[in-house]
């Protein structure tokens, strides 16, 4: 009906391994969204997340507590968390009752960090699937720490995990390299930043691994993993510094395009702004180059560039 209030809600499912900056991202993104004029509701789906730095609209801890589960069932932290998510999956009426009064808000779901929840366990995927039935359009925002770029073996592992997550979660998906402002603290990059964000020819990573006697033994395995990632050709990354509003804006543009928010009726945009979102302000090369110049010292060379001069 033409005059009916919109019922579709939008949001982000913030996922990623422990320590990748999910909670900090939710805090920074919620502040940025409020500055844009959006009504934001942050939902904590991690029962192990204590001392939340943001105002929490819904907290799964009100339904089930990790400590209580561990004590009652004699489970460890990982097993207890899986039980909590299965319990939430079995009690989605509780979650729906909490979310329904917030209809009209933009949702940020702060999810648990256990990797298996996003790669093969079904509870979280089922929860997201049910939210879609409630007309809640989510984008999965997968954070990984940028320091993995400094180690070829770890970066291949991140690529495989990111690919598995994209295939399993079944949501519109973007991957972020978080903590870009700290990337120099982790060591030199072997290649320019765009090599990692665009996931370019991965054979060069194999050559770096071959120089290590330990990884040389697993060359065939690494070749197959790299081939798998390249065959799907799905994984790419957006660099993020949560303290930089330009960086947050680039991420938000990608999220809005993924879940369709930028073409919705809740936020009126000028034609110029809509075209910017549609065309993507994202000629990624120029934006990534600017980020590299900002966070990597100009005088520094990549490890690959140094090797070529020897």
From Swiss-Prot:
Signal peptide: none annotated. The record marks 78 as: Stabilizes the phosphate intermediate. One of its GO terms (molecular function) is hydrolase activity. Disulfide bonds: none annotated. It comes from the Eukaryota. A motif (Gly-Pro-Asn (GPN)-loop) lies at residues 76-78. The keyword Transport does not apply. The modification N-acetylalanine is found at residue 2. InterPro entries: Gpn (IPR004130), Gpn2 (IPR030231), P-loop_NTPase (IPR027417). The keyword Nucleotide-binding applies. GTP binds at residues 19-24, 178-181. Keywords: Acetylation, GTP-binding, Hydrolase, Nucleotide-binding. Pfam families: ATP_bind_1 (PF03029). Belongs to the GPN-loop GTPase family. Heterodimers with GPN1 or GPN3. Binds to RNA polymerase II (RNAPII). PANTHER family: GPN-LOOP GTPASE 2, XPA-BINDING PROTEIN 1-RELATED. Small GTPase required for proper localization of RNA polymerase II and III (RNAPII and RNAPIII). May act at an RNAP assembly step prior to nuclear import. This is GPN-loop GTPase 2. It comes from Mus musculus.
